[in-house]
Amino acid sequence: MIKKIVLSLITVLSFCSLALAQNKQVTGTVTDEKGEPIIGATVVAEGTSAGTTTGGDGQFTLTVPANATLSISFIGYETQKVSVAGKTHIDVTLGEEATGIEDVVVIGYGTGKKIGSVIGSVDQVKSEKIENRPSTNVVDALQGQVAGLQIMTGNGELTSTSSIRIHGLGSMGADTSPLILLDGAPIQASTLQTINQNDIASVNVLKDASATSIYGSRAANGVIYVQTKTGRRNQESVDVTLTGQYSMSSAVSPELNMMSANEMLDYIGAAVAVRLSGDALTTPDKIASGRQYFIRNFGLAKFMDENYNPMNDYKWWNEILERNAPMYQVDLSVSGGSAKTSYYFSGNYANKTGILPGSELDRYNFRTNIDTRANNWLRLGLNLGLGYQHSSVADTNESQGSLYVSNPVMASLITPPYQPLYDDNGQMLNFFDATQAINPLMTADYMPRWQNRITMNGMAFIELTPVKGLTIRSSLAVDAFDWRSHGASSPETPTPSGKFGTGSASELFQRFYEWTWTNTAEYKHTWNEVHNFTALLGEETLYRNNNSFSVASTGITSSRFLNIAMGTEVSGGLPTYSIAQSASNSVFGRLEYNFAERYFISGLLRNDASSRFGENNRNALFWAVGGMWNIKNETFLRDNQTISDLSLKVSYGTQGNSGIGDYNHRQYMAAGSAYGGYTTWMVSGIGNPDLMWESQNTLTVGANIELWRKLSLSIEYYRRQTNDMLMSIPLAPSGGYSGRAGNVGGMRNSGIDLSLNYDIYASKDWFVNFHATFNYNKNQLTDLWEPGLEFVYMGNGLQAYSVGDPFPTWTMQEWRGVDPETGLDTWTTADGGITSNFNQAALVNLGTSLYAPYTGGFGVTAAWKGLSLTADFSWVHGNYALNNTMYFVANADMGLSSQFNQCDLAWDYWQQEGDQARYPRLDQAINFDSRMLEKASFLRLKYIQLAYTLPSHIMEKTKFIKGLKVWVGGRNLWTVTGYNGLDPEAAEKGVDVDTYPNTREFTFGLEFKF
């Protein structure tokens, strides 16, 4: 019995020894991507109950099976799984969760913060609102997405740029564009609008002084911070994404309702009859008589048959503009990472044909983002973007013969429909007899225009963490481009008398580069777990160089060699060369404190020195303070299930603006024409050594609330006062100079931003969201350059500086309508009366502005399983534009003297007493007055997309493709407006005439993930 017991004990002990031999002790350290230890991370051996948490130094010790797999996790970080087979010690780096990164913003040189902990006014647009849009202009995708950010794409030209404004127009003469940062490096707005949209991870818009003052003078009009995509450390596999899309473009708006050939002849016949008879009433017999007179006496018989009926009836809009222009785009990106290094590489090619004849764009983009942590105290990185762009440009500024008739846009409207396109042999005509101009379809053949642009932008940085909480960083950023523009006119260009005989060519070169060297030290410390401090100190140096060269020649005799070397003489005077250089140096600092994530305060100082001002005024000190109360984190609200977020914030600060020419503080000379074999020199500008910084003071008060974790509302009030505005002060003409740079006047922008986001429904398979933005901005001049001066005409006869009104305010002869008794146009006189004599009409301040006081957008997103629908709208309200096109297409004078076709609005003319008409009797000239000033408000379906992502279990069967997404979409598909021009958005430039139309796109795309 005893023997059996002993043997049994030996057997049990043997099994226990074997079991113990299969377990082992593993130690390790868990850190974040900066090498900081993560305290409290959970370490678990999968499939067992063995687990522990990391201590104060991020270290752990755990006994686990010999071949166990450890799962390491921590809130806000991606879970890592590591096999311990053959290992007794492991070091693990946890990267932030991808979903969390989207809610992190980088403000003012420091490390990222959660949006909810930012005092300043900041809005974020995520990548899904930007990528895969059928446009080569990435900025266009931001329209309507951020309250207070106004994006206007004024035309559809392939290389055009959008205007960008944050909280209105901040100055009369200085730069009004926001600072653009790409991964922290400053770039030109033109560079931003050419980068690959699929490289963008997020766009952060900084709007108030607390968020922007740290950037100094360049951020006087706000900041747009663009973050590009990166790889992730410890990524198990390489992610490869291949995207391709095909789009078709057409003009965004249908043509104006232009007259047919018979309608045009009847209309002009009516005008002829009225002018011959003096009787404004037009009857069918009088119209027929006037029509025949017009045909016989204006050389139109060759376009008519024996019965004086037109042999052709072309809709020139359809011939010139109504075409589907294709766009092809392909994008390839590769991302991944090891324990120490993350990387992202991408390449993009886009080819887009314009809707105007002769316009085409080829663009190549390449990007490299590399980030490596050499050890726990050293981090290195490089972000680099390269681009090449070639575009053939449709010249919309060319005029020949009658005004605008060679401009393809205007020609599509005004070319008479009876003008044939082909000769008797079926060959396309190269010259139109009716308009005495080149066939607009062939303008690009005779007058080629093209542009090349090479861009480079990037930043290299080194980051040190010598002690816990201290980050020292040095970065060097570069933004550069080379631009070349070529234009020519062939000696074969047809004219009324034959051909030009000699051609011409011109070349323009521009080279721009800017480098920025930034050095910062940031220290973060938490004391007693509730007192959180952050201190930042920095220094920054910027240098900018911009030079250009242009030359033109004439006398080219061969259409085969249209370049400047083939000319016999230089045209337009001597070749021109210019170089502009500027530099600035800044020092700055910021202190931030929050108590238990409830009470936040911050303060910052920045001193800027700029070479654009004289020695006595080069330095300027700017500052900002801000505070926030996160009420949700109070004990009385922390557990409230209804209110999931509630905070109040306020900030006040000063900023400066140096966005003027580089040498306005100096008197300088320029080369003039040659005289006696020598180049002459002349004083080119009057310098102002007392020129100083334009200053701004900005107050912002805001509140954020979120209910049930699904409905959020943000509201902010702002007031931005600009003083000592930089502008050219008008001088007496007798002095020989039109103006001199100075600091004068004041301007105020005040308004409200509203942002709403509502997750209407969310379940396992369904998701429905609605979002909206709204901005009201009141812009007004507060004073001008002389005490008591309240109103000054701007010199263009259209606009004025007016204290108390928006800048600029429209100021024209005020049209008072057509007199029902006489059929004559009437206008306001200086004493407020009415006159039918245009020479007695006064210039009147109409109190309306070019810029809209109300802007916004809204959209919906709905998803069911793998199917999703997105629709985004944008709108503006209250802006006015001069619809100059109406002067040419609703004007009997233009129809009669130049044979310009007319639109159907022209039929609304006065004939007899009592008529209420828009246009006067047909023997009266149309004048340039406020009748052409129209409200350019609009609502536009900016983008819509229907997409389907195939289920993952289907993709897994391929063993190769991880994901597949297919979509169809459209841009600018629907517009509601009362504007009578081609496109209300084109009215952004103020005077709308011959503008390359905006485009609408239909697109189809595929995205593969490998």
List each language-model region with its residue ranges:
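Short, small/polar-rich motifs associated with maturation and membrane association
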Residues: 1-367, 379-381, 385-387, 457, ...
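Conserved C-terminal beta-signal and adjacent last beta-strands/turns
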Residues: 8, 333, 769, 849-877, ...
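Residue-level recognition of beta-strand termini and adjacent short loop/turns
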Residues: 47, 66, 86, 375, ...
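Surface-exposed loop/interface segments of Gram-negative outer-membrane beta-barrel transport/assembly proteins
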Residues: 100, 116-118, 233-313, 354-361, ...
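Extended, hydrophobic alpha-helical segments in both membrane/secreted and soluble proteins
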Residues: 200, 366-368, 474, 517, ...
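Residues on the lipid-exposed face of transmembrane beta-strands in outer-membrane beta-barrel proteins
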Residues: 228, 332-336, 366-372, 458-464, ...
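Transmembrane beta-strand segments that form the barrel wall of outer-membrane beta-barrel proteins
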Residues: 347-353, 601-610, 759
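Solvent-exposed loop/turn segments connecting transmembrane beta-strands
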Residues: 355-357, 611-617
